[in-house]
Amino acid sequence: MSLPMLQVALDNQTMDSAYETTRLIAEEVDIIEVGTILCVGEGVRAVRDLKALYPHKIVLADAKIADAGKILSRMCFEANADWVTVICCADINTAKGALDVAKEFNGDVQIELTGYWTWEQAQQWRDAGIGQVVYHRSRDAQAAGVAWGEADITAIKRLSDMGFKVTVTGGLALEDLPLFKGIPIHVFIAGRSIRDAASPVEAARQFKRSIAELWG
């Protein structure tokens, strides 16, 4: 089982704020996510600028595309994104359109599982050639005190068994990682737990050490 990668979510409102994080920890992570908040705040230039600074890193545009899949994904890929996200409630043709464009750029598409989705949809994504999903505990659910539970673990295992590469996100803390031991997680996303730490560098390194210990 390969080691899960570590992704930092830049849900900053400005590039200046995002740079404060990347200057510290870009070299400690595998994937740099231009979060939805930053995508809205700064547009695709955020993707272009971060990829220019860190060409050796995977840069994800968390656009959460809901419609106009080909147009919006092309905007992201032309800004040199490696991956883009499509929201789970989008029509299957939106996901297919985004994937068609991704292939032109040797990129990839992730389905963001935020909110309601079904296993029938999951099979449609697989049948369409989608290989990545993001299992997401929403920001608002976290604020309401919703913790990771057995239902989450069961769903993640089932997605993995279907052949998806699963990314896990949603207020992920270091102490949550053992919950997922034994599952071939593709990526763990940490946002505030790294960005807001007293030492973001050490927080990122602790995540990497824990991942190596649990999956090594």
Curated annotation (Swiss-Prot):
EC id: 4.1.1.85
UniProt keywords, alphabetically: Carbohydrate metabolism, Decarboxylase, Lyase, Magnesium, Metal-binding
Keyword Metal-binding in record: yes
A GO biological process held by the record: L-ascorbic acid catabolic process
Top-rank taxon, per record: Bacteria
Site (Transition state stabilizer): K64, D67
Induction: Induced by L-ascorbate. Repressed by UlaR.
Binding site for Mg(2+): E33, D62
Protein name, UniProt field: 3-keto-L-gulonate-6-phosphate decarboxylase UlaD
Species assigned in the record: Escherichia coli (strain K12)
Gene giving rise to this polypeptide: ulaD
